[in-house]
From Swiss-Prot:
Name of the featured protein: Urocanate hydratase
Highest rank taxon of the organism: Bacteria
GO MF annotation: an example: urocanate hydratase activity
Name of the coding gene: hutU
Keywords assigned by UniProt, alphabetized: Cytoplasm, Histidine metabolism, Lyase, NAD
Catalytic activity as recorded in UniProt: 4-imidazolone-5-propanoate = trans-urocanate + H2O
Organism: Acinetobacter baumannii (strain AYE)
Length: 558
């Protein structure tokens, strides 16, 4: 049946709070609450159209599917598993109590047809849904979900290029959507000013309201004057500017303005829905996308080419310039910018050594809705990892500066060994009553062992295995076997159709012994696949980590 097509509903969704169950167990209550949390108006970019973030990244295929998912989760037995196919609940099957309660597959296409044109045809027929990464896998926590990764990137860039000190320096970037909205706060936390260009005033307003950006300039001259003043004063202030990056970056080049760092996080991965062509209004863009999609895609990619050319010009000035994973270089290359890949992606430039040790975006949310539960887990993290001053600094800054969106949540980058240690501790806190309700633990699909994305996470692998996508499939299979609460397998997140495959995992800490056993398996195995993947590619850091952690890798450690 393909007649269910309602994508707009004027309704406000918020997850239940407290300890009263609306489902039959916490293992089904958790995905229910996190699905609804993804559509909380304080969390999602366009919740009335089911869009969570990232262009058209949705939580459910349409409202009829959302209703049926909610109803099914409320009635799901403790030994049943719900299957979700591109945002549509398609089956409930008898499994067992340690099996996942939900298995999700979003946006997956046979490789020959894995492109936006074919996907958009399916989407128009209500046969597919773009799940992005954490939108369709129900573990989005707002812009906080990427803040620390962006912060770690800026800090490492500062270490490499500016002797570890970003005071008095400024970052030029664009995009203040659900992901890009993390950039201004991350730059501030790293000690730098930032100029953040955004073409939708509503997105700027959202970031101002949630304190991710400090202030808005009236025009480019005003923005540059503020940057000049704040950098001279050594203040780390973030500035939003309403405009089109494909116009403003070339103008900055023309003026000879020299930022200290340049990147971008517009929704360039989706030219039909996420990147405004030069000279167009947003309303015109959306209307023409319906009537003449091919022309719109062409116009958007032409503007991306101008944007990337300006980034290349900044690189020629000696400005550290990097792609932040939105595939804008690929789009520009397809429009004739032959050297678009002359500036690197952020993973090979700054993050890969962390991935080699299984370190990535570990996140958790308090199903109670009580911020105190998160503050107590913050303290537990510090207690269990007493010597990591960098992590403690992050947690302190996060508590001070990051506003919770929807259910209270936290993210911190930790790796193999520590994830299981923290998960077991959180489960014990639930068992003892120290936390008022269960905790869910998940992560971004952007992690060390869960993604194949040659223009982002697996760019420039030293053995040339950038495009091998067996790894996220193995990761999903292993997490399913280990007893995760829900597991997802997606295509196209971050960089768009045809350019990535990736998997997600979420596990519930409900305070039971059974949960502890599942947590120990899943939160060990999941980051271990990242160490395995990088060790297999020949990275010495990963090989040494595998040996230190006692991983059984037949071709490497035996």
């Amino acid at each position: 049946m393909t007649t269910m097509t309602t994508k707009f509903r004027d309704v406000e969704i918020r997850a239940p709070r407290g300890t009263e169950l609306t489902a039959k167990s916490w293992l089904t209550e958790a995905p229910l609450r996190m699905l609804m949390n993804n559509l909380d108006p304080d969390v999602a970019e366009n919740p009335k159209e089911l869009v969570v973030y990232g262009g058209i990244g949705r939580a459910a295929r349409n409202w009829e599917c959302f209703d049926k998912i909610v109803d099914t989760l409320k009635n799901l037995e403790t030994d049943e598993t719900l299957l979700v196919q591109s945002g549509k609940p398609v089956g409930v099957f008898k499994t067992h109590k340690d099996a996942p309660r939900v298995l999700i597959a979003n946006s997956n296409l046979v490789p020959h047809w894995a492109n936006w044109e074919h996907f958009n045809e399916l989407d128009a027929k209500a046969l597919a849904m773009y799940g992005q990464m954490t939108a369709g896998s129900w573990i989005y926590i707002g812009s906080q979900g990427i803040v620390q990764g962006t912060y770690e990137t800026f800090v490492e860039a500062g270490r490499q290029h500016y002797n570890g000190d970003l005071k008095g320096r400024w970052v030029l970037t664009a995009g203040l959507g659900g992901m890009g909205g993390a950039q201004p706060l991350a730059a501030t936390l790293a000690g730098a000013c930032s100029l953040n260009i955004e073409c939708q005033q509503a997105s700027i307003d959202f970031r101002l309201r949630t304190r991710y950006v400090d202030e808005q300039a009236t025009d480019l001259d005003d923005a540059l004057a503020r940057i000049d003043r704040y950098t001279k004063e050594g203040k780390a202030i973030s500035i939003a500017l309403h405009g089109n990056a494909a116009e403003i970056l070339p103008e900055l080049v023309r003026r000879g303005v020299r930022p200290d760092m340049v990147t971008d996080q517009t929704s360039a991965h989706d030219p039909l829905n996420g990147y405004l062509p030069v000279g167009w209004t947003w309303d015109e863009y959306r209307e023409r996308a319906k009537k003449e999609p091919e022309a719109v895609v062409k116009a958007a990619k032409q503007s991306m080419a101008k944007h990337v050319q300006a980034m290349l010009d900044f690189q020629k000035m000696g400005v550290p310039t990097f792609d932040y994973g939105n595939n804008i270089r690929q789009m520009a290359k397809e429009e004739g910018v032959a050297n678009a890949f002359d500036f690197p992606g952020f993973v090979p430039a700054y993050i890969r050594p962390l991935f080699c040790r299984g370190i990535g975006p570990f996140r958790w949310a308090a199903l109670s809705g009580d911020p105190e539960d998160i503050y107590k887990t913050d303290a537990k993290v510090k207690e269990l990892i007493p010597d990591d001053e960098h992590l403690h600094h992050w947690l302190d800054m996060a508590r001070e500066r990051i506003s919770f969106q929807g259910l209270p949540a936290r993210i911190c980058w930790v790796g193999l060994g520590l994830r299981a240690k923290l998960g077991l501790a959180f489960n014990e806190m639930v068992r003892s009553g120290e936390l008022s309700a269960p905790i869910v633990i998940g992560r971004d699909h952007l992690d060390s062992g869960s993604v194949a994305s040659p223009n982002r996470e697996t760019e420039a692998m030293q053995d040339g295995s950038d495009a091998v996508s067996d790894w996220p499939l193995l990761n999903a299979l292993l997490n399913t076997a280990g007893g995760a609460t829900w597991v997802s397998l997606h295509h196209g997140g971050g960089v768009g159709m045809g350019f990535s495959q990736h998997s997600g995992v979420v596990i519930v800490c409900d305070g039971t012994d059974e949960a502890a056993a599942r947590i120990a398996r899943v939160l060990t195995n999941d980051p271990a696949t990242g160490v395995m993947r990088h060790a297999d590619a020949g990275y010495e850091i990963a090989i040494n980590c595998a040996k230190e952690q006692g991983l059984h890798l037949p071709m490497i450690t035996q």
